C-alpha cells in the first residue's frame, strides 16, 4: 500500500516501459499553455508528477538499475518545464519541495553528482529569492519564511552528506547574508 512518503512494490520493467514508451507527456511539457492554480495544485500536490518520477527513479536505484533511474530523472527534467512548474512553490504549501529534494537525492544516489548539484543549486537559488521576499514581509509571512529555511537546510545538509560541501556552504552563506 502506498502513501505520500512510501512507495509500494513496483515491477520496474513495466514502470520503465510506461514512463519512457507509453506515456508521451506532450501536454505536460508544453510551455505555451497557461497553468493555473488548480493545475499547479493537481500536478505538484495531489497527483505530483515530480513525485511520480522521483518514486520511479528510487525504485530503479533500489533494484540496481541506475542507468534507467538516470533516464527517468532526466525525462522528468525535460517534460516538467520550470516555466510552468517552478522548482520553488513554498508559497502554495504543496508537496513540490519534498519531491524536488527526492529528485536531487536520486541523482546523488545514482552517481550523477553534477546533475544533483546543478538541480540543488537552481532550487536553492529560487528558494533564496522567496526567502528574501518573505523576510521583507516577515510579520505576515513567517510560516512561508520558515518553510523556505527548512528546505534550504535540507538541501545544504544533503549536499554535505553527498560530498558537495562547496554547494552546502554556498547555500548557508547566501541564506545568512539575507539575515544581515
Residue spans for each PLM region:
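C-terminal luminal/periplasmic domains and tails of membrane-associated envelope-modifying transferases
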Residues: 1-180
Amino acid at each position: 500500500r502506498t502513501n505520500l512518503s512510501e512507495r509500494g512494490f513496483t515491477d520496474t520493467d513495466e514502470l520503465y516501459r510506461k514512463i519512457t514508451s507509453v506515456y508521451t507527456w506532450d501536454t505536460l511539457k508544453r510551455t505555451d499553455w497557461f497553468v493555473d492554480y488548480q493545475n499547479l495544485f493537481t500536478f505538484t500536490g495531489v497527483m505530483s508528477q515530480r513525485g511520480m518520477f522521483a518514486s520511479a527513479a528510487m525504485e530503479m536505484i533500489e533494484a540496481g538499475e541506475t542507468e534507467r533511474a538516470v533516464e527517468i530523472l532526466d525525462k522528468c527534467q525535460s517534460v516538467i518545464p520550470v516555466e510552468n512548474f517552478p522548482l520553488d512553490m513554498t508559497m502554495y504549501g504543496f508537496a513540490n519541495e519534498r519531491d524536488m529534494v527526492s529528485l536531487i537525492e536520486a541523482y546523488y544516489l545514482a552517481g550523477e553528482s553534477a546533475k544533483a548539484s546543478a538541480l540543488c543549486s537552481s532550487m536553492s537559488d529560487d528558494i533564496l529569492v522567496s526567502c528574501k521576499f518573505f523576510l521583507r514581509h516577515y510579520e505576515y509571512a513567517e510560516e512561508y519564511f520558515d518553510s523556505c529555511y527548512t528546505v534550504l537546510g535540507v538541501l545544504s545538509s544533503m549536499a554535505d552528506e553527498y560530498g558537495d560541501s562547496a554547494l552546502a556552504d554556498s547555500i548557508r552563506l547566501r541564506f545568512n547574508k539575507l539575515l544581515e
